[in-house]
Amino acid sequence: MTDRKRGFFGWTWFVMWRFLLLLALLLLVLRFVPPPTTSFMLQSDYPVSQHWVSIDELPAHMPLAVVAAEDQLFPEHFGVDINSITKALNQYDDGEGLRGASTITQQTAKNLLLWPGRNFVRKGLEAMLAVSLEAIWGKKRILEVYLNVAEFGKGIYGVEAASQHYFNKSARYLSNNEAARLAVLLPSPRNRNPNNLTPYLRQRVAWGEKQMRQLGSGYLKPILTN
């Protein structure tokens, strides 16, 4: 190996480990401090509305609603769902395009640090960051940040801003049905309104409420009381 190549790889390694160290320090800080913004907020085409609320102040059915709708294996996996990823890759091989298959942890990583769109580079970074979040933050913090940074409408981020916008009250006072109606927005928040649901979305809300009952009020208790 020539001196030039050794110099290039040495410089690349130096930059990489410095970047990873800075990333780890950032995640460590955000374990305790609410993120002042996110990459998705910075890229928003709309005025941003977001109000932080502690997960301890939310009714237990609000986090349960998003877990029931988005990631029922959230308490069990370590950031990524291998079965869902395998299924998505098989569908991609069949010509169906690259689908989501993202856990709540992956969605949190994406919303916080990455960019919209679906490609293998972003999905790879998303998975790597998800595992890092699980190791550094833990489940409760991941769920808390997700509930505060997920998009629920055009420029509306987090359940507190969403609750005030759609229901004119704090997320602290959301009912089971209202929580399920907010959760159903998550796959396509800019095209859905919890006060003007299509027949399909009303079915999804009913399904979500049924899943919440089946999972039970204690499903997330080991996480929320940690």
UniProtKB/Swiss-Prot annotation:
Keyword annotations from UniProtKB, A to Z: Cell inner membrane, Cell membrane, Cell shape, Cell wall biogenesis/degradation, Glycosyltransferase, Membrane, Peptidoglycan synthesis, Transferase, Transmembrane, Transmembrane helix
Principal EC category: transferase
Record-level Gene Ontology MF annotations: pentosyltransferase activity; peptidoglycan glycosyltransferase activity
Keyword Coiled coil part of the UniProt annotation: no
Reaction it catalyzes: [GlcNAc-(1->4)-Mur2Ac(oyl-L-Ala-gamma-D-Glu-L-Lys-D-Ala-D-Ala)](n)-di-trans,octa-cis-undecaprenyl diphosphate + beta-D-GlcNAc-(1->4)-Mur2Ac(oyl-L-Ala-gamma-D-Glu-L-Lys-D-Ala-D-Ala)-di-trans,octa-cis-undecaprenyl diphosphate = [GlcNAc-(1->4)-Mur2Ac(oyl-L-Ala-gamma-D-Glu-L-Lys-D-Ala-D-Ala)](n+1)-di-trans,octa-cis-undecaprenyl diphosphate + di-trans,octa-cis-undecaprenyl diphosphate + H(+)
Gene Ontology process terms (BP): cell wall organization; peptidoglycan biosynthetic process; regulation of cell shape
Gene3D superfamilies: Biosynthetic peptidoglycan transglycosylase-like
Highest taxon listed in the record's lineage: Bacteria
Main function: Peptidoglycan polymerase that catalyzes glycan chain elongation from lipid-linked precursors.
Protein name: Biosynthetic peptidoglycan transglycosylase
Organism field: Shewanella frigidimarina (strain NCIMB 400)
Lineage: Bacteria, Pseudomonadati, Pseudomonadota, Gammaproteobacteria, Alteromonadales
